[in-house]
Amino acid sequence: PEDLELAWNILKGPDKNDRRTPPVRWKIPEQRTMSDYKVAWVPGWKDYETSEQTKQVIQKFIQVIKDQGGNTQQLIPKEDLHRRTLELHQRLSFMTIMQDLPWFVKPLMVKGLKNGYLKGAENIVWKFKDTFSDYSQLIGQRMQIIKEWETYFDDFDLLVCPSGFGPAYKRCKIGTPITYEGKTIKYIDYVYPYNACFNASGHPAISIPLGLGKEGLPVGVQVVGSYWSEPDLLHFAKLVSKHTEGFVKHKPYPI
């Protein structure tokens, strides 16, 4: 966490020559202890469950928080908020990728995505509009979704959730299905659904490494906060790192 904190301190706030963006008065959380945090957690998301090992890793992490005096509660956001945020990311991503491309290039881009990163993906709207009006409508939806997430965080400081279906996986060709615990997962569904939603809403998140799993592969959790909670996330990560394994280098695979 100290390395991340250093990077964040360098990057945070507007450039000194930017006169249009006011500086944020960041809250300083140094005096907070684990007992000052109220933490929500989920073992997975609707339509995107996780492996048994991932659930166990999350539960073990929550127990660490409890043991240090933290307040925890399992609570999934209402109204399919995760699903709608994920759909927003999909539409905004496509609009960003396709903007300003000649009309004859767009089908080639779609074909490349279908045969690569998004191979086998379901519920993808391949035909979409990319006018300024459509973009403005999406931004309006994004503002509403951000509001709903912020309402959720009114009752909690942080949210602990999965960072993927299972542990880190062996490097493979993009689009190759990944099998873990006897279940084969589409390449896009192994990590994307658990992280992209917060990229869409813009909520700060941090990945906390928790050592190695039963196969000797890295495991961890994702912790998300409300807007402007970066100092709290970093402070929480430093507190909890004293009671977890943290990053452990795994043995390299034979070539």
What does each model-found stretch correspond to?
Residues 1-11, 200, 204-211, 215-220:
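Short glycine/serine-rich loop segments
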Residues 1-56, 244-255:
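A short helix-breaking turn/cap at a secondary-structure junction
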Residues 33-42, 91-150, 162-167, 171, ...:
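Short helix-loop capping/hinge segments that flank enzyme active sites or metal/cofactor-binding pockets
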